[in-house]
Each structure stands twice: as C-alpha cells, then as structure tokens.
UniProtKB/Swiss-Prot annotation:
UniProt xrefs under PROSITE patterns: SAM_MT_TRMB (PS51625)
PANTHER family on file: 3-DEOXY-D-MANNO-OCTULOSONIC-ACID TRANSFERASE/TRNA GUANINE-N 7 - -METHYLTRANSFERASE, PENTACOTRIPEPTIDE-REPEAT REGION OF PRORP DOMAIN-CONTAINING PROTEIN
Name recorded for this polypeptide: tRNA (guanine-N(7)-)-methyltransferase
Quaternary structure and partners: Monomer.
Membership in a protein family: Belongs to the class I-like SAM-binding methyltransferase superfamily. TrmB family.
Signal peptide interval: none
Active site per UniProt: 144
C-alpha cells in the first residue's frame, strides 16, 4: 500500500491550486486499538492544523533538530527512527486516520516522547505552519508514484514542492526521498537536479545507498523478495 499524500496542482507562480477538501481525523475504518490511541494519545502527541507558524521549542518542550516525515503510513518505520534518535524531534504528517491511530499506538507502546503527529494535507502544513529555515531533515518515503502518464502531474515531487521544502530546510538540512518505482526515481532526480540551492549527496550524482537511519519497511522487504529495486535520493540545502 502506498502512502497517499494529497498533492495539489500548482499555478504558474508555484502556489497550490487548492481543492476544497477537509480532513476529518476519524475518517476511515478504525480498529478498536487505533480508535483508543486517537482518543487517548492524540491529546499528548497530536497537533491540530493552524494558520499560524508553529514554535518547535514550545511544541516539543525543548530545542533540538527537527525531522519532518511526510506520509508515514502506519508509522512503524517512523516510530523506529524516533526511538533510535531520542536527541532529535520528529513531526509526522499522514492524511489517513487509521495510520495516525496506529502510529500513536506504537509510539505510546515504545514510550517515545520526541514525536508529534498531524492528520492534514502536508503541502498546506508546509505553507502555513512550518517556519522557513527550521528543519534539519525532510523525509518522503514511498509516495504514490501515479504511474499512469496522464496522472504524472499528481506526483507530489514537482519543482514548486521541492522549492517549498528547500525554503523550510536549514542550511545544511537534507531532503531524503525513497521510491520503489524507477520512473518516479528518475523524475525525482530530474526535479531535484534542476533546483539551485540543492546539492546531490550521491557520489555518482544520482542515487545513494539506503542509509542506516532509514529502517526497511515490511512493504520494502516484500519488494526485495520479488526482486523489486528501491531508490534513495538525498539532497542537501547548500544556499
């Protein structure tokens, strides 16, 4: 199952063409465990959408580098990363409430305190809530490839989106993407390479080996067994 990050089309100035759509946190079929997690752990780890920029030091109760993950699915790999790096703060965004509930349940079970989650459109969160020059890392793992040619424009990785991410990264911050769809990997590489301000961290100027920091997902393990490839891209903000 792909992480379905709602991605708008853009006008000629790079502004998102909004579709009228509201996200209800309880949407989707919830298991009892997910419903329990949303009711009990959302007040602790959940972040409501706001038109105002967030203050990360206040949100997390401390100053620490912030990693933003867009489209965390059921949250298993995100929680693993959060637990492995207690010295960092993590904000995860996912539009499907069952995934948010599952992530909250896992985070509670693991006892992590350095994670906050949102159930909203990631592009709108970036525009309205994330301050410029504030993120150490942005992660986008296995977004929907929209593999049919007529749907390619729906892919979240487009020049305006990548430029938006660039503006939110600190100097030296990294945008890390991964996909199991080779054509999308090539598209990501083309988009990212066209933007002044990013440096490809690949020695061969294309893809990087999977870093130890990114856990292998069950979905990815299944792909490996079937002989599917996975492509990681890491681009640093250098100006």
């Amino acid at each position: 199952m792909k992480n379905d990050v709602i991605s708008p089309e853009f006008d000629e100035n790079g502004r998102p063409l909004r579709r009228i759509r509201s996200f209800v946190r309880r949407q989707g079929r919830l298991t009892k465990g997910q419903e329990h997690a949303l009711e009990n752990y959302w007040p602790v780890m959940g972040v409501e959408f706001s038109e105002a920029p967030v203050d990360f030091a206040t949100l997390f109760g401390r100053e620490a580098p912030v990693t933003l993950e867009i489209g965390f699915g059921m949250g298993a790999s995100l929680v693993a990363m959060v637990k492995a790096r207690p010295e960092q703060n993590f904000l995860g965004i996912e539009v499907h409430s069952p995934g948010v509930g599952a992530c909250l349940a896992s985070a509670h079970e693991e006892g992590v305190e350095n994670l906050r989650v949102m159930c909203h459109d990631a592009v709108e969160v970036l525009h309205k809530m994330i301050p410029d020059n504030s993120l150490s890392m942005v992660q986008l793992f296995f977004p929907d490839p929209w593999h049919k040619a007529r749907h390619n424009k729906r892919r979240i990785v487009q020049v305006p989106f990548a430029e938006l991410v660039l503006s939110k990264l600190k100097l030296g911050g990294v945008f890390h993407m991964a996909t199991d769809w080779e054509a999308y990997a090539e598209h990501m590489l083309e988009v990212m390479s066209s933007i002044d301000g990013y440096k490809n961290l690949s020695e061969s100027n294309d893809y990087v080996p999977r870093p130890e920091s990114r856990p292998v997902t069950k979905f990815e393990q299944r792909g490996h067994r079937l002989g599917h490839g996975v492509w990681d891209l890491m681009f640093e903000r250098v100006k």
